[in-house]
C-alpha cells in the first residue's frame, strides 16, 4: 500500500503503475481517496518506508508525465499540475 490516491490527483484509471525497487509495478484494485495497493512480487525485497515513484526514474526504470497523460487521456501539464501538495516532489 502507498499513501497516495485520487484526492492527491492520482486518477482512478486502470493501468496505473509506480516504481518501487527499480521496477514498474501495477496498481491493483481501485485507487482509493488516500491510498492505493501495489502488486509486489515475492522476490522483490520491499519494506515499509521504501520509495515509490509516481513520475520519474528509479534504477533505470521510468514513468513520465507523458506516459500518465496517455493513460489518463489528457496532457502532461494536467498530470503534473493536478498532483496535490501532499505528494512529495524531489527534483534531481
Question: Each predicted region: which residue ranges?
Answer:
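Active-site anion/phosphate-binding pocket segments in diverse small-molecule metabolic enzymes
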Residues: 1-92
Amino acid at each position: 500500500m502507498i499513501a497516495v490516491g485520487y484526492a492527491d490527483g492520482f486518477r482512478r484509471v486502470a493501468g496505473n503503475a509506480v516504481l518501487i525497487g527499480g521496477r514498474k509495478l501495477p496498481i491493483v484494485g481501485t485507487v482509493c481517496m488516500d491510498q492505493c495497493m501495489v502488486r509486489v512480487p515475492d522476490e522483490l525485497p520491499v519494506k515499509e518506508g521504501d520509495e515509490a515513484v509516481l513520475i520519474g526514474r528509479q534504477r533505470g526504470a521510468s514513468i513520465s508525465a507523458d506516459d500518465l497523460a496517455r493513460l489518463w487521456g489528457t496532457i502532461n501539464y494536467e498530470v503534473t499540475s493536478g498532483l496535490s501538495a501532499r505528494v512529495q516532489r524531489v527534483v534531481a
